């Protein structure tokens, strides 16, 4: 488990963009980030799992002649092969879905762009007001900082008393600006929600959505057909491992039974 935790921690701490900074690659897609995370996680599980199996074989497996470590390596090889075979198929599936839903994203973006243009002046005005408030607060606090440096500890209590009402005033004025912005953007939020609802309702009965559903089902069917050979290879690869474990276990039970009968 330590290897798994370490792998996940390293992935999140370094970030998905870290390697692109050094390699100068293009930004990753969502699928690339998911695939990289899954690869790191599976490799970590495989390594930590092998360590655990080795410990188990040392304590128990040798007595029962289970050959756990050999079977684990066989399983790891089988799953690695499955992952490499399904990788291109899965990538193709998501690429096709992304291409087929491009029209849907474009329809949604039309409304978003229109609303963004309308609310931009309010956001800009809000930002300017906040900056003015901060500048006003800074000018009021600056002389107090000078007094503190001159009077040192003696004026610390006095400075705190002066800063408290200034901070409260800044907080109240900021809340006022936020409430004002919320009131200004409220109608646009409602409008956007209504238009999005109307757009989705229209899409339910549209030929485009029906066509997309048909394509999605077709992609799923294609994915299933292409993945079937890889899954069959996995099943065939697991059979010898399971048979080996079964034979070893039965042999061990038979040996133990003979020893007990001889006593």
Swiss-Prot record:
One of its GO terms (cellular component) is extracellular vesicle. Participates in the reverse transport of cholesterol from tissues to the liver for excretion by promoting cholesterol efflux from tissues and by acting as a cofactor for the lecithin cholesterol acyltransferase (LCAT). As part of the SPAP complex, activates spermatozoa motility. This is Apolipoprotein A-I. Keywords: Cholesterol metabolism, Glycoprotein, HDL, Lipid metabolism, Lipid transport, Lipoprotein, Oxidation, Palmitate, Phosphoprotein, Repeat, Secreted, Signal, Steroid metabolism, Sterol metabolism, Transport. Sequence repeats lie at residues 66-87, 88-109, 110-120, 121-142, 143-164, 165-186, 187-206, 207-228, 229-239, 240-263. SUPFAM superfamilies: Apolipoprotein A-I (SSF58113). The modification Methionine sulfoxide is found at residue 108. Belongs to the apolipoprotein A1/A4/E family. It is found in: Secreted. The lineage of its organism: Eukaryota, Metazoa, Chordata, Craniata, Vertebrata. It comes from the Eukaryota. Homodimer. Interacts with APOA1BP and CLU. Component of a sperm activating protein complex (SPAP), consisting of APOA1, an immunoglobulin heavy chain, an immunoglobulin light chain and albumin. Interacts with NDRG1. Interacts with SCGB3A2. Interacts with NAXE and YJEFN3. One of its GO terms (biological process) is phospholipid efflux. Residues 1-18 form the signal peptide. Residues 66-263 are annotated as: 10 X approximate tandem repeats. GO terms for molecular function: amyloid-beta binding; apolipoprotein A-I receptor binding; chemorepellent activity; cholesterol binding; cholesterol transfer activity; enzyme binding; heat shock protein binding; high-density lipoprotein particle binding. Glycosylated. PANTHER family: APOLIPOPROTEIN (PTHR18976), APOLIPOPROTEIN A-I (PTHR18976:SF11). It holds the Pfam family Apolipoprotein.
